[in-house]
From Swiss-Prot:
Protein name (record): Kynurenine 3-monooxygenase
Top EC class for this record: oxidoreductase
GO molecular function terms noted in the UniProt entry: FAD binding; kynurenine 3-monooxygenase activity; NAD(P)H oxidase H2O2-forming activity
Function, as annotated: Catalyzes the hydroxylation of L-kynurenine (L-Kyn) to form 3-hydroxy-L-kynurenine (L-3OHKyn). Required for synthesis of quinolinic acid.
Organism per entry: Xenopus tropicalis
Family: Belongs to the aromatic-ring hydroxylase family. KMO subfamily.
Entry EC number(s): 1.14.13.9
Record-level GO cellular component terms: mitochondrial outer membrane
Chain ranges passing through the membrane: 385-404, 425-445
List of residues binding FAD: V19, Y37, E38, A39, R40, A57, R111, L136, D304, M317, N318
Length: 473
């Protein structure tokens, strides 16, 4: 516990979303006086919950953070295990691609229900006070003062020893960082938006296999579906905005789905599909990078406020939860010395945040296009074989990201090294096979047949896209 004079130090957590409410638990457990401020009303009692609703994929990093505050088992019970991707072709064929080994899976969890549980967990600490409908207007990180506007339109001034900004991709706390010199910031809106649809239960049961993340990859766009506890599926259609703009009538939507997702129409229902498709406009997705994550020992940002990422690796929440865990581990290592912990946290997490942002962008290309290719399936099999033979040396990319706590930037370094080794190995095997075949041809074929065979081989090799890429390098 951190003491200043004869009082506990006060930590103000701005943002009562997933990362903010979990952070409140971490700081409260360490004995700090925690004040949590949330701009929205308390979602546990709200009639309608606004905001993002993309289903979340909870994996190892997030579970480890929850375990540190004793919430992992309770939250895991709220999720549905997904052990593999289920790929849906245009013709309706289905094929599965396991995420990892048989015991490895990710959990489909509902964002709102998870947020409610985390708020309730934080509220149980006697040293946590929650303030809902308190919108941060301004803060002075040098003095630790904050200005809020409450639901009565009253201006409220508050002060804290440490301000923790967990207020999302459009963080007000982060804006204060931008007033400082040597603060780097960039954001990108990707050209794709998303719409959400629902596959209802069929006769009280799941309409599709429940323990999969279902994917309809269509190269430039895709649809996914995650299972819910009520036996429904939440579908998300990711597509370029200009393609959404072409679909203006129910008939156009039906024609589009009949062309690209024909097997989903019966699952969703024609009437429900044409109604739900136009409930909301397509939503945008933003990726945020910045550095540093702290100002002196007075303020730190975490979660989307520090590193909003696109949702295609399922790591946004997990990375945010890992922020909380890493900071807690640093507090233990440095005996709650905020001056050391904040700067060390920023030093460690900035490269990892940038790395998972890049990986999320890469995985969108993989999910919507690469999973269709036989080469992708072959490489997955090669990765799995090498991992079985050398489990500590060769670890598949997805396994490193999702089922370990290897730092994200180290994941990329290891992945690039592994790719290089595998490519060299495959090239060597291919070359050895070609040389062996050539030897047999020379030894046993007549000369004129040999010349004809060599010509055919050269024609084949020139058309081999993979070998051409290797030679180009």
């Amino acid at each position: 516990m951190e003491i200043q004079g004869n009082r506990k130090k006060t930590v103000s957590v701005v943002g009562g979303g997933l990362v903010g409410s979990l952070n409140a638990c971490f700081f409260a457990k360490k004995g700090f006086q925690v004040e949590l401020y949330e701009a929205r009303e308390d979602i546990r009692y709200a009639r309608m919950v606004s905001g993002r609703s993309i289903n979340l994929a909870l994996s190892h990093r997030g579970l480890q953070a929850l375990k540190a505050v004793g919430l992992d088992e309770k939250i895991a019970a709220m999720g549905i295990p997904m052990r593999a991707r289920m790929i849906h072709s245009v013709k309706g064929r289905k094929s599965s691609i396991p995420y990892g080994k048989q015991h490895q899976y990710i959990l489909s969890v509902d964002r709102a229900n998870l947020n409610k549980e985390l708020l309730s967990a934080a509220e149980k600490y006697s040293n946590v006070t929650m303030h809902f409908e308190h919108k941060l207007r301004d803060c002075n990180v040098d003095s630790g003062t904050m200005t809020f506007l409450n639901n009565m339109e009253n201006i409220i001034e508050k002060k804290a020893d440490l301000i923790v900004g967990c207020d999302g991709a459009f963080s007000v706390v982060r804006k204060q960082f931008m007033r400082k010199s040597r603060f780097n910031y960039s954001h990108v809106y990707i050209p794709h938006g998303y719409k959400e649809l629902t596959i209802p239960p069929r006769k009280g049961e799941f309409a599709m296999e429940p323990n999969y993340l279902h994917i309809w990859p269509r190269n430039t766009f895709m649809m996914i579906a995650l299972p819910n506890l009520d036996k429904s599926f939440t579908c998300t259609l990711f597509m370029p905005f200009e393609d959404f703009e072409k679909l203006t009538t129910g008939d156009q939507v039906l024609d589009f789905f009949k062309t690209y997702f024909p097997d989903s129409i019966e699952l969703i229902g024609e009437k429900k599909l044409t109604e739900d498709f136009f409930l909301l406009p397509p939503q945008a997705m933003i990726s945020v990078k910045c550095s540093s994550f702290c100002i002196d020992h007075k303020c730190v940002i975490m979660g989307d406020a520090a590193h909003a990422v696109v949702p295609f690796y399922g790591q946004g929440m997990n990375a945010g939860f890992e922020d909380c865990l890493v900071f807690s581990e640093l507090m233990e290592q440095y005996q709650n010395n905020l001056r050391i912990c904040l700067h060390e946290f920023s030093r460690l997490r900035v490269p990892d945040a940038h790395a998972i942002s890049d990986l999320a962008m890469y995985n969108y290309k993989e999910m919507r296009a690469h999973v269709n290719s036989k080469w992708f399936i072959f490489r997955k099999q090669v990765d799995n074989i090498l991992n079985a033979i050398m489990p500590t040396t060769f670890i598949p990319l997805y396994t490193m990201v999702t089922f370990s706590r290897i730092r994200y930037h180290e994941v990329i370094l290891r992945w690039k090294w592994q790719k290089k080794i595998i490519n060299v190995g495959l090239f060597t095997v291919g070359t050895t096979g070609s040389v062996g075949a050539a030897y047999l041809v020379i030894k046993y074929l007549p000369f004129n047949k040999y010349i004809e065979h060599v010509g055919n081989c050269l024609t084949h090799l020139k058309g081999n896209a993979y070998l051409s890429r290797l030679w180009a390098k």
